[in-house]
Amino acid sequence: MHINQMQPMLAEQLDDYLSRIRRIFVELGIPEDLPTARGLELCREPTELVVGETRPQGREFYLTAAAATAWHALKLAAAEEGIALLMVSAFRSADYQADIIRRKLGKGQTIDEILRVLAPPGYSEHHSGRAIDIGSDECPELGEQFENTRAFHWLANNAQRFEFCLSFPRDNPFGYVYEPWHWCYRGD
């Protein structure tokens, strides 16, 4: 099992986290070997988060302090070029990830279908507090059509300067669908 080293976690906390993830896998019918087979890394939840952004409706999105600082700089640089970037999603816990899967299973989707578009609990970059789903007022949220927006083209050309990268390009090795909206902070 690969472990994402982005966030410190005490050995006891890591053991508890792994036990929780294993229980969720069993409950949801996720094959135990799926992370290894797909080359996924365990993403630990940070011990500290800050409000990275608050939407006009009052919804708060949480990130690590470093990711929030980088996001603000990235968003400001884009705005200076007339590009509006919208935060659609940021931190979510492994338990919340499991709830999303439960809802999809309840709607009749199979676990295989779900895991093509959603990481198994414990393995989503969103757990790290460093991943952001980015949208634009140019198109509906979380759709492949985001790649045709000015926002996406700006990100493709500039995000790396702020230590963000596109996590799931076309034909990515992790078995996920193409997610032009999903960007992860890779800085310290």
Show where each model-derived region lies:
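Extracytoplasmic cell-surface/polysaccharide-interacting catalytic and binding patches
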Residues: 1-90, 95-188
